[in-house]
UniProtKB/Swiss-Prot annotation:
Subunit structure: Forms a ternary complex with IGFR1 and ITGAV:ITGB3. Forms a ternary complex with IGFR1 and ITGA6:ITGB4. Forms a ternary complex with IGFBP3 and ALS.
Gene: IGF1
Function statement: The insulin-like growth factors, isolated from plasma, are structurally and functionally related to insulin but have a much higher growth-promoting activity. May be a physiological regulator of [1-14C]-2-deoxy-D-glucose (2DG) transport and glycogen synthesis in osteoblasts. Stimulates glucose transport in bone-derived osteoblastic (PyMS) cells and is effective at much lower concentrations than insulin, not only regarding glycogen and DNA synthesis but also with regard to enhancing glucose uptake. May play a role in synapse maturation.
Disordered: annotated span: 120-153
Region named B: 49-77
UniProt feature, compositional bias: Polar residues: 142-153
UniProt-listed Gene3D superfamilies: Insulin-like
Protein name, UniProt field: Insulin-like growth factor 1
Species, as recorded: Rhinopithecus roxellana (Golden snub-nosed monkey)
Amino acid sequence: MGKISSLPTQLFKCCFCDFLKVKMHIMSSSHLLYLALCLLTFTSSATAGPETLCGAELVDALQFVCGDRGFYFNKPTGYGSSSRRAPQTGIVDECCFRSCDLRRLEMYCAPLKPAKSARSVRAQRHTDMPKAQKEVHLKNASRGSAGNKNYRM
């Protein structure tokens, strides 16, 4: 009985092998090369990890990651650090000479600047405008009285 049950599997293997032989014969070498490149690209991009970035590629990556905040080439140091410093490593040392990831790039982004609220801008404009108008009014008034001419505002 073992031979009878294995007969369909042998038949399937034979037919499948014949099918592959025909398909491989029809497929040209350029198709095989294209298929191999697609498979390599897919497998390498799926497992992409840290990579080295130098020159314009490094700057482009920092601009993309940091956006409008900007970035530093050296890590910003805190206030009150001792006068004896260890040699600083910059983004070039970390990402060009060695590989770095997205988190490492983000460490070199400048901090977000606190945005002024709309209310404080309105309050500032409100206090600035009368002062400027008052100065113009005083200048025009002094001209008008000195030259006996009537100036209109």
